Amino acid sequence: MLPPPRPAAALALPVLLLLLVVLTPPPTGARPSPGPDYLRRGWMRLLAEGEGCAPCRPEECAAPRGCLAGRVRDACGCCWECANLEGQLCDLDPSAHFYGHCGEQLECRLDTGGDLSRGEVPEPLCACRSQSPLCGSDGHTYSQICRLQEAARARPDANLTVAHPGPCESGPQIVSHPYDTWNVTGQDVIFGCEVFAYPMASIEWRKDGLDIQLPGDDPHISVQFRGGPQRFEVTGWLQIQAVRPSDEGTYRCLGRNALGQVEAPASLTVLTPDQLNSTGIPQLRSLNLVPEEEAESEENDDYY
């Protein structure tokens, strides 16, 4: 015996729920959110596939707005739609139209940056073809052409263009400054400093009241430098081993290149064990002093 036919209302309910999900607009913002927007556009394309492509009437196409990565043709090759931005999901197969196609200067690549050994599946993401920095006509350095084009489309009235390849010339800028700190005699102290500049900056350390560049001839003070962590940056450290009361004072990180100089001070407070016991940690914290361990943890934070 055949089961009784389902009422028409029951058959239509799943379709209505799907349409409600599909047609719900994504949250607004300068850069579209990858998840909801992809689901909406992808399911809309799947629904359209069942109907096939209607005759193309460009005059009936809605003009897309806010396309920071430019425009591409839709699945039927008729109307324009916003292209996908860098970092958004995309269709590896050019003939597919679920996630969408990447914009100008972008290409769809498998992102293998995840931990494949733990079962993470590579995703197809839009990636910029070039990773070379550029100087914009606004005097700002852009990490690559795709970022500059996004900024240009976000601010069309600015007439932003490429001034020249490579970063804009810039005086030094302190990216991560040394922090005020304290410690007990006999312990080690480290100050850190990161400087951005183009041309590259040099870093030196000085102490208020001394005319020499550290470390001088002091065997318990050492300095170290390395490039990075980002391009056109340099990082410097000042280490004082087994601090003494005479080490107390203000130390300065100085960054300079041909276009200028910048500096950032940090104070060191040195306590004897007796002073520490009589003063107490709460009183020290009221002076806005940061212990060495906390200062190091803040310096290791990603500042981008």
Curated annotation (Swiss-Prot):
Residues 120-170 form the Kazal-like domain. Disulfide bonds join 53-76, 56-78, 61-79, 67-82, 90-108, 102-126, 135-168, 193-253. Its main location: secreted. Gene3D superfamilies: 3.30.60.30, 4.10.40.20, Immunoglobulins. GO terms for cellular component: extracellular space; interstitial matrix. Glycans are attached at residues 159, 183, 277. This is Kazal-type serine protease inhibitor domain-containing protein 1. Keywords: Developmental protein, Differentiation, Disulfide bond, Extracellular matrix, Glycoprotein, Immunoglobulin domain, Osteogenesis, Secreted, Signal. Involved in the proliferation of osteoblasts during bone formation and bone regeneration. Promotes matrix assembly. Residues 49-129 form the IGFBP N-terminal domain. GO terms for molecular function: insulin-like growth factor binding. GO terms for biological process: cell differentiation; extracellular matrix organization; ossification; regulation of cell growth; regulation of signal transduction. The keyword DNA damage does not apply.
